Amino acid sequence: MNRKYRKTVIAGNWKMNKTPSETKEFMTAFKAILPKGRWCDVALCVPAVCIPTAVRAMRETRVGIGAENMNANASGAYTGEISADMLTDAGCKYVIIGHSERREMYGETDADVNAKVLTALNAGLTPIMCCGETLEQREAGVTMEHIAMQIKMGLRGVSEDKIRKVVIAYEPIWAIGTGRTATPEQAQEVCEGIRAVVRKLYSSKNARAISVLYGGSMNEKNAYDLLAQPDIDGGLIGGASLVPEKFVKIIEAANQPTE
């Protein structure tokens, strides 16, 4: 895809899948079929116990490893939690923040997301901040109203000089893990709206520069049509990122020029 002002990012989200041993097997197969030459930015966000294995395996490549969540606090009595500094020291470049599954299952709020975004940026991580609407919100016609509020709250306190480090992922909740996918036109409409929100909060220059991903059941079959849209700069990939061949096909789709 041709992106004059911004990066194309293909990010995998493994969720709670794969052991360290399975991660090693995946990385071996993945490296063997990675496209040659220049290609888009690629991230693999893996379970915490798999991060060291993934970092070691991808050290000689341009693939960045990321985490699926983090705690906003620097340290302390937070049993079971992982800090941003722990992630950077382990070799992470990215971290997913505010995924709908975290919001729904664990009660994460926009304020929680905001605290994590600020902490991630200060630690040198690239936050992939998620936003999206339920089917009920879409049918009620309040999709952009809801998403605009998520973005405004999530980016509160993020300075002009750091906003371009943030990646925003639009994930229609009704399309995650359901096999349903927003049409390219539906996804484009929302991603364009997200860029408009960033323009209001910051500037046209920053809105042009920020990467907006689509994260609702993108796969190797629909990737090209979604990525051909002018305001969709990549994908946050779930199930398809667990299979090396499928993930590589999405990367290849992102590298194809559009008409």
PLM-predicted stretches and their roles:
Residues M1-E259:
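Active-site loop-to-helix "anion-binding N-cap" substructures in soluble metabolic enzymes
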